[in-house]
């Protein structure tokens, strides 16, 4: 597959002390969101968004050993279709449907990539990312003349939790200043990150996670034990 020998893959450590680390990380994030100024809030919210996208690489690259350079484009399709076609749906139904759309695009990319890996797979996924950008994001038929779509803020219980609603108070709490982004938008992002991280941890602990690791270690050996290698790769994408 492009090389004479393959180096040994790094050992996949089984998650431990998940609950204490989750609580510690959440508390530290809340301290930054509520206790620091808007620069820190913006940086933390950007970090939380990046974590959600990076978790897909944890599964795809870390568990299955498949190199993908299309994850940002796939995530972009979710946001694009959410803002254009599902913006009227209540939160969190809209983002969930957007995630399913991203899963469909991930599957479309995975099918031609089933028989390659390594650098060749990276080239294929990079080409797919460029194709998605040109056919969807830069297509005025879909994205409009400006190439940008407005996304309505999430509403929970009739309250605007969007990043610009700095006057929002929940339990009498708000940020230390009135400069966007809204601190409670960051809290929503934190909750989503915690849920997604726990889901990835459970995948690692499950039978599916063990199948992923077997495919990463040796595809032929995994197939010999009855694992459907193609299905495992598509599921990871």
Question: Which residues are covered by each model-predicted region?
Answer:
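Transmembrane alpha-helices and adjacent helix-loop boundaries
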Residues: 1-237
